[in-house]
């Protein structure tokens, strides 16, 4: 049986996608959010953002009958900060330290990796993933069309631009 999963960042586009699924009676079995942790006990998300996620949006989604799941990586911001570089000859043995512009590994190691692991646990062809990409983002839309047939943008399907998502 096909499962329908919304990949939710808590931003305007992915939130609008869930609202559209609800308003248009699209099937939705699970909403997943990947929380970056500062350390094992403290969220790395902005306090206002994680408050919105946990205390405003999730209760509404659950009142609509949707199951939500917060995923967390085993790796935290602090793990990345104190990571000892192994591969680079120039920096081998040094600590990673503060994320560098355009070279930040935090999102990759603490957010994306746990989402990819979650999806790998599902069988191809058994799930459809809703993602929040607006119709006026052609470059991003073209990447999903070429990379993964299991992804669909409800914003594109219903003609939502970035501006309309914000409303």
Feature locations, PLM:
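Nucleotide-activated chemistry modules centered on ATP-dependent adenylation/adenylyltransferase
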Residues: 1-167
């Amino acid at each position: 049986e096909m499962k329908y999963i919304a990949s939710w960042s808590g931003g305007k586009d992915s939130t609008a996608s869930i609202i559209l699924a609800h308003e248009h009676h699209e099937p939705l079995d699970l909403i997943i959010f990947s929380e970056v942790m500062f350390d094992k006990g403290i969220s790395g998300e902005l306090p206002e953002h994680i408050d919105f996620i946990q205390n405003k949006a999730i209760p509404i989604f659950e009142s609509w009958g949707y199951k939500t799941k917060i995923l967390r990586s085993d790796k935290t911001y602090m793990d990345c900060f104190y990571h000892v570089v192994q591969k680079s000859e120039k920096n081998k043995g040094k600590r990673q330290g503060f994320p560098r512009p355009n070279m930040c590994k935090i999102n990759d190691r603490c957010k994306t990796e746990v989402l990819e692991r979650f999806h790998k646990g599902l069988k191809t062809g058994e799930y459809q993933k809703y993602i929040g990409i607006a119709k006026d983002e052609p470059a991003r839309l073209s990447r999903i069309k070429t990379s993964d047939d299991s992804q669909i943008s409800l914003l594109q399907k219903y003609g939502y631009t970035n501006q309309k998502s914000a409303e």
